[in-house]
């Protein structure tokens, strides 16, 4: 990432949708994607919305029920001076995978800080549906998010490949990963 991480406040406010409640299909898919990667440890990060908090809490329970380890849970605000403290903590534990959820505005600010200031890798990250939209990915820039993968609300998979967000076709839950996108 070559531009400073902080986005203009008006752009972030327009993207500050609190997000819908996570669906069971979405939670199942996020869990499946993480287990498929054969990860033992995760660090979970989320915005402070009720939906993001509930989604990541449910994921953490499922993860630990599988005998896996949650190294840390980091929350971030929608607006902050720089997100440096949260980004540093999120990346510090060096987990096998990172899991992210939250409203797009705060997530974009946090993600831009991660890219600018830490060794965080999008390709080792799985995200919930609210982050797999053109709007959310566009705030960070798809070219900055190679191999970021996540679940759709209907239990499908979305991924960022070659600078583009790839989602299942409408009406088909499908897997964005017929070509290895998970």
Each model region followed by its residue ranges:
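Intrinsically disordered/low-complexity terminal segments and short unstructured peptides
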Residues: 1, 40-42, 181
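Flexible loop/hinge segments that line or gate small-molecule binding clefts
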Residues: 1-17
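Short hydrophobic/aromatic-rich motifs at helix boundaries and adjacent loops
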Residues: 3-4, 28-32, 83
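An alpha-beta-alpha
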Residues: 13-75
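Extracellular/periplasmic bilobed ligand-binding domains
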Residues: 52-156
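Extracellular/periplasmic ligand-binding modules, especially the Venus flytrap/periplasmic-binding
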Residues: 107-109, 145-182
């Amino acid at each position: 990432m070559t531009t400073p991480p902080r986005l203009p406040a008006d752009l972030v406010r327009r993207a500050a949708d609190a997000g819908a409640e996570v669906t069971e299909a979405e939670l199942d898919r996020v869990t499946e994607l993480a287990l498929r990667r054969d990860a033992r440890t995760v660090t979970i990060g989320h915005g402070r919305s009720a939906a993001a908090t509930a989604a990541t809490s449910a994921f953490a329970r499922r993860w630990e029920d599988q005998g896996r380890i949650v190294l840390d849970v980091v929350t971030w605000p929608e607006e902050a001076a720089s997100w440096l403290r949260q980004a540093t903590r999120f990346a510090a534990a060096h987990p096998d995978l990172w899991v992210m959820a939250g409203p797009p505005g705060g997530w974009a600010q946090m993600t831009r800080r991660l890219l600018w200031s830490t060794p965080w890798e999008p390709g080792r990250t799985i995200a919930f549906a609210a982050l797999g939209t053109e709007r959310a990915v566009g705030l960070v820039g798809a070219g900055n998010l190679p191999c970021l993968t996540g679940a759709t609300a209907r239990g499908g998979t979305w991924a960022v490949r070659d600078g583009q967000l790839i989602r299942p076709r409408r009406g088909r839950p499908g897997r964005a990963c017929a070509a290895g996108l998970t």
